[in-house]
């Protein structure tokens, strides 16, 4: 079975590609027995499943082949980012992912809906030459599984804000290779 969700206690700094910088650091702090609220990470494996959606891939392929991001065509980049965001926001989270998120959220509150923070953890976030501070979204005081699932979807979509796409473009990063954990 694929690891769509991992508890903080299972995370460490060697897992950047799977959980991103923020979650990897939360895992390190948890394992050092420092006071960290209990939590879990929705891994990049889950994002990748969403991102392999045929329509989403079609959008990315059209823009990649048009070389919009090599040419610095701001309008084409903006159009691409908006199309990807809308597709992610309209997507239904596959049952196999929603079920494990639901289970992990249920464990946090012992079956009761509790407020949680839903935060993005990008795989490119902690590159030594780039500060991605504030590029992806965070949602605080989220209560109930439907709200949690919606916040996860909105975090995934925030990978494709105009600002985030332009920033990656300015660093020469491959737009299609960026992944997001939550």
Each model region followed by its residue ranges:
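N-terminal beta-alpha lobe that positions the nucleotide/phosphoryl donor
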Residues: 1-181
């Amino acid at each position: 079975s694929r690891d769509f969700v991992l508890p903080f206690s299972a995370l460490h700094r060697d897992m950047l590609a799977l959980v991103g910088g923020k979650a990897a650091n939360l895992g390190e702090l948890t394992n050092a027995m420092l006071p960290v609220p209990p939590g879990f990470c929705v891994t990049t494996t889950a994002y990748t499943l969403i991102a392999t959606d045929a329509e989403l891939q079609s959008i990315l392929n059209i823009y990649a082949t048009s070389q919009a991001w090599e040419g610095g065509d701001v309008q084409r980049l903006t159009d691409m980012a908006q199309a990807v965001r809308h597709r992610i926001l309209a997507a239904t989270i596959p049952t196999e992912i929603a079920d494990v998120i639901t289970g992990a959220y249920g464990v946090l509150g012992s079956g009761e809906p509790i407020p949680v923070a839903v935060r993005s953890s990008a795989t490119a976030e902690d590159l030594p030459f780039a500060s991605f501070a504030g590029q992806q979204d965070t949602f605080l005081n989220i209560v109930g599984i439907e709200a949690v699932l919606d916040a996860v979807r909105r975090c995934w979509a925030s990978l494709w804000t105009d600002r985030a796409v332009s920033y990656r473009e300015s660093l020469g990063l491959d737009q299609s290779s960026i992944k997001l954990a939550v």
